[in-house]
Every structure is written in structure tokens, then in C-alpha cells.
A protein has these predicted regions:
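Formylglycine-dependent sulfatase
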Residues: 1-420
Length: 420
């Protein structure tokens, strides 16, 4: 791995949402969505329509991205193993100023992870743990809410205020306090503030982690109204499909019913209207994030960075949203393991290219390093996509010479998957 400091290297902005499905960007063939800013990235960049995660949960997927390997190599199989990134510090050694704003899911949460600065936001629906709890956490968003004298909405406040409504809402709530204190707005605004306030001229690596559209599905009224009359092409699973699923999937569905994970009070025997409600709230949260992506792009332009910046948009895994009777993650269905992946950099990345070749989300790691002039480790399982980004997908060059001919995901057993 060789490194050379060069202040003409491109800035790199990695935007990662949490739990966003691949069918949530209008320009990629999903007209029920309203995502003008993500559409712009797609039109002016290269998007991968078959990008699959290495694990269908947050921490193990992110560890693969930031360690360049599958979970069986990183030894991070669930959301509870300790880990930190390795290649962020390599960017720092190569002259990059490295900043994380929002969700990273490093464990422990407040570890540096190779970043010069971290403004982390992790606990969208979790209480402030007691100080003697092994996962005690008080993040930037908690501090901002406290400074404004606001109580953070969570499953605890919602059960306290209206238990019956909580149990019937399937995790769908309208944001209850100041709009700018919604965690996705807070993260997006913090990223804009950092870009506006920065005075240094060295290249930067900015990782922006939006907490949404991970549940609770809690958009503001403004964005929920956009989807008031939208009909989504998704329907409830049949009783026949549910009965034919393996025992571990039946037990997983029951765990969702029993434990109200992340404010989602799940139930069996959903109706089509239940599915439509889930997608309306979820899509509204995606559109909120889309607006913030647009504001970040505008700020990069205003600050004079846009011509020398690579923007990458992706998500750590997706969400079943009622498909196959499941909610959230933990399964290997396509609707959970396939995620959006878009590269934008007009002078460095081929424009208006939609690539159907198989890639893994972790492949962005060596790709970023190569853009920064750093040779990725030869023993990494992640593979660089730079040739595809600059010269075209393999099916346009040599169909027999693909980056991957298969993708692979894995997951360890935890307290949620009692039947695994």
C-alpha cells in the first residue's frame, strides 16, 4: 500500500443512509418516488443497479465497507462486535482531512476510527442509557435537543403518550417536534455547516451518515404530504407464502411481533393498506434525505469544491417493508440485500451510466483509495470499480471479464434471530 500526499487530489464525500431500499430513486425506474437530487446524481454519474451488501445488518455491513472484507474475515457478524475502520487513517496519512458527520456504527460508538473529527449521531430511537450501561451513549443530536429543551421522540415517549396508537402504527409516526431537529435534517444541516465553516485547502474525506430511513419511519408533515395519494406497487404477502417459509423466518417474524424493535410494533396478517402506509412514511423519509443531499451539493458548489469532488451515495442495507411478511433486515431477500449505489464526479466518472453488473457494497473501499492515489491491499476481498466508472461496465467491454460473477452475504446469530 503506497501513499503520496498531493493537495490536488479530489475531495471525497461518502453519503451513506441507513436501511434504504434499491427501489427508492425515481431515475432508476421507480416513478412513485420523488427524489430530484438523487436523480441528478444518477443522470450525471454512474449507478449500480445490482449492488449487494455483505451482511443484512448495519454494523457488519459497515465493517465490511471500512475494512474491505467479508464478515468471516472481519469477524464482525452482528451489530454487537467491536470494530474500527482501517483505511480512513490511510487517507489521513495521504493528506486528507477526514470527518464523520452522522451515523457510522463504529463500536465503541465514540472511537476515533481514523477520523480527525467526528460529529456522530447514532441513537435515533434509543434512550439515554444509564452511565453504568456498557453501551452508554450521548451523541451530538442528544446534545442539540437538550440545548433546545426538547424531549427526543422514541418508542418510550410514544408508548407513554398513547400506547394503543403505538401498537397499531407499524413504526409509522409523524415527526413530533421542531423540523430542523429531525435526525436526518440535523445531520444534513451539520454537514452544510461544516463545509461552510471550513477554511483549510487540503483535500477532505467527508463521510455523512443519515440515520434514516431506518425506523421509526418518522417524516415531517411536509414530506408525508407529498405521498398522500401515491400508490406503491407493493402488496401484502399471502398466507401460503408465509406458511411455506422456513422455521427460522417464522420465528424472526414472531420476534418482530414480540419485541417492537426500533418502534415497529409488527403484526402478522398485514393488509395491502398496511403495506401502502409503510411505504408512504418510508418514502417521505427518503425524500427528506434527498432534499439534504441537494443542499449539500449546492454548498459544495458555493464553496468552490464541486469541480474537484467525488460524491458517492449508498446505504448499508435495505428494508423488507412488509415484503414476504417481514420488516426491517436480518433476511437474505433481494429487497433487503440490494441497495442503491451511485458515483458522481463529472470529470472522473462516466455520466448517464446505469451498470447492471454485480458489485458488493464493500467494493467502494478500494475504489475510494484508488481515487485518492492509494494502492489498496492485495489481500482485500473488496474489488476496485474504477475501471467500470471511467471506461464503462463490463457488458460494454468484455462480457467475459466481469468484476464479480456472484455476490455473497452472511450474518451471525443474535438475540433477534432466535431460530437461526
Amino acid at each position: 500500500m503506497s501513499q503520496k500526499i498531493d493537495h490536488q487530489k479530489p475531495n471525497i464525500v461518502l453519503i451513506m443512509t441507513d436501511q434504504q431500499r434499491a427501489d427508492t430513486i425515481a431515475e432508476l425506474g421507480h416513478p412513485w418516488m420523488q427524489t430530484p437530487n438523487l436523480d441528478r446524481l444518477v443522470k450525471q454519474g454512474t449507478s449500480f443497479t445490482n449492488c449487494f451488501v455483505t451482511s443484512p445488518v448495519c454494523v457488519s455491513s459497515r465493517a465490511s465497507v471500512f475494512l474491505g472484507a467479508y464478515p468471516h474475515t472481519t469477524n464482525v457478524y452482528t451489530n454487537f462486535e467491536t470494530w474500527q475502520p482501517n483505511w480512513v487513517s490511510w487517507l489521513a496519512q495521504a493528506g486528507y482531512h477526514c470527518v464523520n458527520i452522522g451515523k457510522m456504527h463504529i463500536n465503541p460508538y465514540d472511537a476515533k476510527g481514523g477520523f480527525h473529527q467526528r460529529f456522530f449521531v447514532e441513537n435515533k430511537d434509543r434512550p439515554l442509557f444509564l452511565e453504568d450501561h456498557e453501551r452508554a451513549l450521548y451523541d451530538e443530536w442528544d446534545k442539540a435537543l437538550k440545548a433546545r429543551g426538547l424531549e427526543k421522540p422514541s418508542r418510550y415517549t410514544r408508548v407513554r403518550d398513547d400506547r394503543d396508537a403505538f401498537l397499531k402504527n407499524l413504526g409509522c409516526f409523524t415527526w413530533e417536534t421542531d423540523d430542523d431537529m429531525h435526525p436526518d435534517n440535523f445531520v444534513g444541516d451539520t454537514a452544510v455547516w461544516w463545509l461552510e465553516d471550513r477554511k483549510a485547502s487540503s483535500p477532505f474525506f467527508l463521510q455523512i451518515g443519515f440515520p434514516g430511513p431506518h425506523p421509526p419511519y418518522d417524516p415531517t408533515d411536509e414530506f408525508l404530504a407529498i405521498y398522500k395519494d401515491t400508490e406503491f406497487p407493493h402488496r401484502a404477502a399471502s398466507q401460503q407464502e408465509l406458511a411455506q417459509q422456513p422455521k427460522m423466518h417464522q420465528q424472526l417474524r414472531q420476534s418482530m411481533v414480540d419485541f417492537n424493535i426500533d418502534s415497529v410494533a409488527w403484526r402478522e396478517n398485514l393488509t395491502d393498506e398496511d403495506i401502502q402506509r409503510l411505504h408512504r412514511y418510508y418514502a417521505a423519509n427518503v425524500s427528506m434525505i434527498d432534499q439534504k443531499v441537494g443542499q449539500i451539493m449546492d454548498c459544495l458548489d458555493k464553496q468552490g469544491h464541486l469541480d474537484n469532488t467525488i460524491v458517492i451515495f449508498c446505504s448499508d442495507h435495505a428494508d423488507a417493508l412488509g415484503e414476504h411478511g417481514h420488516i426491517q433486515k436480518w433476511t437474505m431477500y433481494d429487497c433487503v440485500t440490494r441497495v442503491p449505489l451511485v458515483f458522481w464526479a463529472p470529470d472522473r466518472v462516466k455520466q448517464q451510466q446505469q451498470c447492471d453488473d454485480l458489485v458488493q457494497l464493500m467494493d467502494i473501499a478500494p475504489t475510494i483509495l484508488q481515487f485518492a492515489g492509494i494502492d489498496p491491499p492485495s489481500n482485500w476481498e473488496a474489488l476496485a470499480m474504477n475501471k467500470m466508472l471511467t471506461s464503462g461496465c463490463w457488458d460494454e467491454q468484455d462480457p467475459n471479464e466481469k468484476l464479480r460473477d456472484h455476490v455473497y452475504a452472511e450474518l451471525g446469530r443474535d438475540h433477534i434471530q432466535s431460530g437461526a
